[in-house]
A protein has these predicted regions:
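C-terminal segment of classical bacterial N-terminal signal peptides
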Residues: 1-5
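Loop/turn elements at helix/coil->beta-strand transitions in domains of secreted/extracellular proteins
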Residues: 10-15, 41-45, 71, 125-131, ...
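Secreted, luminal/periplasmic, and some membrane-associated catalytic domains
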Residues: 53-55, 77-88, 93-106, 146, ...
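His/Asp/Glu-rich, glycine-adjacent segments
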Residues: 67-68, 74-254, 380-381, 385-391, ...
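Acidic, His- and aromatic-enriched active-site or binding-groove loops in soluble protein domains
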Residues: 69-72, 147-189, 258-276, 316-358
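A long, amphipathic alpha-helix that forms part
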Residues: 206-232, 237, 244-294, 321, ...
């Protein structure tokens, strides 16, 4: 479909800027002057909230389609697919912030696993130029069925590699003309290594994701926006900033301590980093004469909390591990506790279904529970501040046993249960969080929300998290 020149001239452009994991109270004149200016001079929605579970891919699917998770099926960052995903090493619990994995899941579920049109797909059908730039995973979600690189420009962590979406010849030529590489930098390329998450003995990164995000901002400002102006058509550009999320996850300011948590200098630097990227885009619009015809929408996908690994009731926390401080919850504690409550074996879906022995935990926190890992009675998809539990055969008795075990744990805050399985005391239905829909992917039987509590810090949120990250680092969910 072609838009008439007069319509094209009057049509506004759109930039959706997503500062991943930005907390509203973090937007201050010191840390984020560009965001403050947009908030104070534009329209400010002062009471926003994320889709729950509050994970990147879940909220990306909502932003991209306008549908709730019950329809999109992107229930979290890690989901149960009920089939071995080849590009995830044969795991049935893939982490879906990954271009090849998204392609595999799309192919398995009739070519479009979310079963909805995305905004970039709809925009380009109406004659708009379209681009998605930024963090691996959510960036592709905005036009995930377009994998040629010809119809929508897609630039993320994998750009220039075999795993990435190809660059069109037009984009290759434009990048070269701007003096920009055809291969995206990695998080390791920032001196100090932003990808360093540390471990229980060593703290994580002390630097923001500057180099990689500067590349993304330069691609948008110096290549994509000028290209779109030359086309003389309206455009939609999605810019998904990994910071502050990536840095708040990995920061080493608060190793094993909940204070200052994610309120330290490295987290503040990550907020400034995202703000700098937005400033680059605004300057480019000014220079290109596009400011008056371009609307900028800023929307974080979720907030953030400081990780707590404390529990006085968890059997998993009472065991000893070689890589976990004594008395703290290990990664995969939920799967360990459920397997113990059901007196069933636990297997690791991300390590060729190997049995998880006493004093060990699964490699990524996920778990297959039952006598046969190929036909699990229960599946746990570990995500962080909340987890997904699947009961593939929807057995109400087994579900009730799991619920009883969870309600006895001090780390549980809320339980949401599939209404098709039944109604259980002390729980809420999945429909109350819009997770009961027509999703193509398997629907969780239970969503477990972990305990959160106040600390003495300026932004006093700490949350129990099922993650390989350490107490004092950052999480959401």
């Amino acid at each position: 479909m072609q838009i008439a020149p007069a319509i094209a001239q009057n049509q506004h452009n759109l930039i959706l800027f997503v500062p991943d994991g930005l907390r509203p109270l973090s937007v201050t004149p010191e840390a984020a002057p560009t965001l403050v200016a947009i908030r104070d001079k534009g329209v400010n929605f002062s009471n926003p909230h994320a889709l729950f579970p509050t994970f990147t891919m879940a909220n990306a699917s909502g932003m991209a389609t306008g549908h709730f998770l019950g329809d999109t099926g992107a229930f979290s960052n890690t989901i149960y697919t009920a089939y071995p995903v080849p590009t995830a090493g044969g795991s049935v619990t893939p982490f879906i912030e990954n271009d090849p994995i998204l392609g595999d899941i799309d192919a398995h579920f009739s070519g479009n696993f979310v079963d909805e049109d995305t905004i970039l797909f709809a925009a380009r059908r109406q004659g708009f130029s379209t681009a998605a730039i930024g963090k691996l995973g959510p960036t592709l979600m905005f036009d995930h069925t377009e994998r040629t690189g010809e119809a929508t420009v897609t630039i993320d962590d994998s750009t220039g590699s075999k795993q990435g979406i190809p660059l069109s010849q037009e984009m290759q030529d434009a990048l070269k003309a701007a003096g920009l590489p055809l291969v995206a930098p990695s998080r390791k390329d920032t001196p100090g290594d932003n990808s360093n998450a540390g471990n229980f003995e060593k703290p994580g990164t002390l630097v923001a994701n500057v180099v990689q995000q500067k590349y993304f901002a330069d691609v948008a400002a110096k290549v994509v926006l000028p290209m779109f102006k030359r086309r003389n058509k309206p455009f939609v550009l999605v810019f998904w900033s990994r910071d502050p999320d990536g840095t708040q996850h990995n920061q080493g300011d608060s190793h094993l301590k909940v204070l200052p948590g994610i309120n330290g200098p490295t987290s503040l630097a990550s907020i400034k980093n995202a703000d700098d990227n937005l400033a680059d885009l605004r300057r480019a619009l000014d220079a290109l004469g596009l400011t008056a015809t371009t609307d900028i929408v800023v929307a974080a996908d979720h907030g953030f909390s400081t990780i707590s690994k404390e529990s006085k009731t968890s059997p998993a926390a009472q065991a000893s591990y070689t890589d976990v401080p004594t008395g703290l919850l290990p990664p995969g504690f939920l799967a360990i506790d459920i397997a113990k409550a059901l007196a069933l074996p636990l297997y690791d879906p991300d390590d060729k279904n190997k049995v998880v022995e006493a004093g060990k935990h699964s490699s990524r926190g996920n778990g297959l529970i039952g006598s046969d890992p190929e036909k699990p009675a229960v599946v746990v998809a570990a995500n962080g501040g909340s987890n997904l539990i699947y009961v593939p055969d929807k057995d109400a008795g087994r579900t009730a046993k799991i619920i009883d075990a969870l309600l006895a744990q001090d780390y549980v805050s809320g339980l949401f249960v599939d209404g098709d399985i039944g109604t259980f005391a002390g729980t809420l239905p999945l429909s109350s969080i819009n997770m009961q829909g027509k999703a193509r992917t398997p629907r969780p039987a239970i969503v477990v929300n972990f305990r959160s509590y106040a600390t003495d810090c300026g932004q006093p949120a700490a949350s129990v998290a099922d993650t390989a990250l350490q107490q004092g680092q950052g999480m959401h969910g």
